[in-house]
Amino acid sequence: MPPKTRGAVRKPRKKDKKNIALGQAHIKSTFNNTIVSITDPNGAVISWASAGEVGFKGSRKSTPFAAQMAAEAAAKRAQEHGLKKVDVFVKGPGSGRETAIRSLQAAGLEVGSIQDVTPAAHNGCRPPKRRRV
């Protein structure tokens, strides 16, 4: 009796190299984490990184240094696809906002414009209680 196989054997899909010169960097900086997504002009994600994905855990994810490392990792992966210039969109109140932008520039990406797209409620849901630090 032949040995049973568990479904089809899947080959790892090779990432195809897109050639994109201009893109957008979306930086979402919360009190707990920083997520950097780099997209093409249509919004399709080329690369992303977060403070947790880069190796930081717990309260260290919310530091500016973690945001810097996440932005560098996302920028390196995006440059492999030929990205040279980005427009930056920053969202959220976190501590890693400026650091992430600076590290995108330091990684070799040319920053065209910086926009703050933090959503502001027009008296919608009740916000969480005030932080006591």
Swiss-Prot record:
Part of the 30S ribosomal subunit. Interacts with proteins S7 and S18. Binds to IF-3. It comes from Arthrobacter sp. (strain FB24). Located on the platform of the 30S subunit, it bridges several disparate RNA helices of the 16S rRNA. Forms part of the Shine-Dalgarno cleft in the 70S ribosome. PROSITE patterns: RIBOSOMAL_S11. One of its GO terms (biological process) is translation. The keyword Plastid does not apply. Belongs to the universal ribosomal protein uS11 family. The gene is rpsK. GO terms for molecular function: rRNA binding; structural constituent of ribosome. Residues 7-17 have a biased composition (Basic residues). NCBIfam families: PRK05309.1, uS11_bact. Keywords: Ribonucleoprotein, Ribosomal protein, RNA-binding, rRNA-binding. It comes from the Bacteria. This is Small ribosomal subunit protein uS11. GO terms for cellular component: ribonucleoprotein complex; ribosome. Signal peptide: none annotated. InterPro entries: Ribosomal_uS11, Ribosomal_uS11_bac-type, Ribosomal_uS11_CS, Ribosomal_uS11_sf. Residues 1-23 are annotated as: Disordered. HAMAP family: Ribosomal_uS11.
